[in-house]
């Protein structure tokens, strides 16, 4: 046993002392150690993950105000989300499809049936003018003591549906329902003149019959001419004008009686 004690005492003989450990200090957070110089730009999270310096977020400086935190990034602008400014957006009327220049050109085409019509303009779906003309037609009937708004809208819907089916069977290119409703609505303008005459005098005499026949021919001729120019239906104007005359004849009967 004495030999074993001597061996242990010789094995553990070092220059290390516990008293020296208490006197020695280690600076892990400061800049005194060798590791602080080499890894000063790195950050170690609580879970022990290494974060490179280029991925570190800039620290916010304290402003001294509790309810007003410091903004690390500038606030986003509306241009960031939408891409373009509000000044570059199209006008509201253009987004709704309302073009007063085209409305005026279509109105002049109806008022001048012998004038050459532009098929590209008439092929557009524009319901702003037809709605206004339907309201004006109902208003003039109301001035004559006839409350026929329901009949006007009902006959208009049925007539547009019938012409839509007929034109799709007759034309090679086909036509949309909006285009048919737009053309028939614009060609209702002469019928507003007939209902306005009915406010002043009666249309049940010979003069009224001649005026009614003229207005029906005017409306049907304008509508058929626009349809054949927009759909390239040369030589079929009479075939298109006949159903148009039947439709506008119903509106004329409402105005006369």
From Swiss-Prot:
InterPro entries: Yip1/4-like, Yip1_dom. Residues 1-124, 168-173, 218-236 are cytoplasmic. It is found in: Endoplasmic reticulum membrane; Golgi apparatus, cis-Golgi network membrane; Cytoplasmic vesicle, COPII-coated vesicle. One of its GO terms (cellular component) is trans-Golgi network. Keywords: Cytoplasmic vesicle, Endoplasmic reticulum, ER-Golgi transport, Golgi apparatus, Membrane, Protein transport, Transmembrane, Transmembrane helix, Transport. Residues 146, 195-196 are lumenal. Residues 75-106 are annotated as: Interaction with Sec23. Pfam families: Yip1. It is a multi-pass membrane protein. The chain crosses the membrane at residues 125-145, 147-167, 174-194, 197-217, 237-257. Its main location: endoplasmic reticulum. One of its GO terms (biological process) is insulin processing. Signal peptide: none annotated. Interacts with the COPII coat components Sec23 (SEC23A and/or SEC23B) and Sec24 (SEC24A and/or SEC24B). Interacts with YIF1A. May interact with RAB1A. Interacts with YIPF3 and YIPF4. Plays a role in transport between endoplasmic reticulum and Golgi. In pancreatic beta cells, required to transport proinsulin from endoplasmic reticulum into the Golgi. Belongs to the YIP1 family. PANTHER family: GOLGI MEMBRANE PROTEIN YIP1 (PTHR21236), PROTEIN YIPF5 (PTHR21236:SF6). This is Protein YIPF5. It comes from Rattus norvegicus.
